[in-house]
């Protein structure tokens, strides 16, 4: 709940899910905290949220927010996306806003870029600097971070410690053209592993060796 100590004028909610269950009681408890966070935004501020995520939509029921996502029902959505999600157009209120060409792969990175573009559009930023900034983003450490090559295999490090993050990671790897994928998974916290064990197992079944 440390984010409830902030004083946001703009709140961006990428998704809401059951996590940190050593602190939160359950998903409803998580949703309650995210709603409190959104309600910290003062009048005249902005709440920008993932309209594709059912938990987020439920959390913000009755809250005024701008939705972004891949579906056309969102005020900000994409079009003409490439197979690896690195390039796409951003459509805002039905009109083309900018063309995104990312230096990182993955549906989750595309969603994050959509969120950033949505905020920029709402604040009246022109398309060109948005395109430049998103193209220059090279990713965060331990997020599909290339570590080198060993015995002919490319080695990557990723901090994916939740089933949804693991799903996003492995879906991204599938777009990279590898013949075989091996995943060495280190569980992070006993509480999370116990609560989400079956979901972790389901995701790890998607690779050749885990």
Residue locations for each model-derived region?
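Switch II (G3) loop of P-loop NTPases
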Residues: 1, 155-161
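Active-site beta-alpha connecting loops in nucleotide-dependent enzymes
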Residues: 140-142, 159, 164-209
């Amino acid at each position: 709940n440390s984010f409830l100590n902030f004083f946001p004028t703009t709140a961006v909610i990428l998704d809401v899910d059951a996590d940190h269950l050593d602190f939160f009681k359950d998903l409803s408890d998580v949703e309650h905290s995210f709603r409190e966070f959104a309600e910290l935004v003062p009048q005249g501020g902005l709440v920008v949220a993932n309209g594709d995520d059912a938990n987020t939509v439920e959390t913000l029921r009755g809250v005024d927010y701008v939705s972004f996502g891949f579906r056309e029902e969102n005020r900000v959505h994409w079009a003409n996306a490439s197979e690896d999600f690195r390039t796409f157009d951003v459509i805002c209120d039905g009109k083309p806003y900018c063309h995104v060409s990312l230096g990182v792969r993955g549906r989750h990175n595309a969603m994050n870029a959509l969120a950033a573009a949505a905020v920029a559009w709402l604040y009246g930023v022109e398309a060109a600097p948005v395109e430049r900034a998103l193209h220059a983003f090279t990713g965060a450490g331990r997020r599909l971070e290339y570590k080198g090559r060993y015995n002919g295999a490319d080695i990557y490090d990723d901090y994916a410690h939740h089933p949804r993050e693991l799903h996003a990671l492995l879906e991204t790897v599938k777009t990279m053209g590898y013949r075989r994928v091996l995943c060495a998974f280190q569980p992070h916290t006993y509480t999370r592993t116990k609560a989400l064990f079956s979901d972790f197992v389901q995701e790890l079944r998607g690779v050749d060796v885990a």
